[in-house]
Amino acid sequence: MITGKLITVEGPDGAGKTTVLEQLIPPLKQKVAQEILTTREPGGVAISEYIRELILDINHTTMDPKTELLLYIAARRQHLVEKVLPALEAGQLVFIDRFIDSSVAYQGAGRGLIKADIQWLNEFATDGLEPDLTLYFDVPSEIGLARINANQQREVNRLDLETIEIHQRVRKGYLALAKEHPKRIVTIDATKPLKEVVSVALEHVLALLLA
């Protein structure tokens, strides 16, 4: 039985969501008694991390969109069973850096795959598990890509090679999801200073936990 809460973190490339999540956890731990787990997709467990390497390998530029989607789904299932569900059943507060919405935005809006097919596959893989809250960090594609290019410490992966048009479609996909699920998805302006973005995210998380 699930007694914990699931919060997912989403955003287009360059939104800074991973950095925000890292800075969100310390102040959150000072305010809540629950044990907190942070993890990521694809990855989080050994099998899923191996799949992540396959997906992001810069040499795999011929990867078919459906192959890409199925690899993400496989990684998601293993991660869920091995790590996420046990934590939720133990009453933990679980943060996942990317989840189902990423598939809809990237493989759906970005790659042009049918949304209904993506949703069915995710329903199958997750047994219908849905986040209690999704923090969507929004940033225009031009700004996101500029941030990526300016970060010399970041290792380039296959997805960084995509055209700006695909990144723009991904963002539109995210914005459509936020409009479709206004109660679950909170849109946060990620162009603001980092400290402000973290503060807004913390407010929304606490609102969920104290409701």
From Swiss-Prot:
InterPro entries: P-loop_NTPase (IPR027417), Thymidylate_kin-like_dom (IPR039430), Thymidylate_kinase (IPR018094). ATP binds at residues 11-18. Keywords: ATP-binding, Kinase, Nucleotide biosynthesis, Nucleotide-binding, Transferase. Gene3D superfamilies: P-loop containing nucleotide triphosphate hydrolases. GO terms for molecular function: ATP binding; dTMP kinase activity. It catalyses: dTMP + ATP = dTDP + ADP. Its EC number is 2.7.4.9. GO terms for cellular component: cytosol. One of its GO terms (biological process) is dTDP biosynthetic process. HAMAP family: Thymidylate_kinase (MF_00165). Phosphorylation of dTMP to form dTDP in both de novo and salvage pathways of dTTP synthesis. Belongs to the thymidylate kinase family. This is Thymidylate kinase. It comes from Streptococcus pyogenes serotype M5 (strain Manfredo).
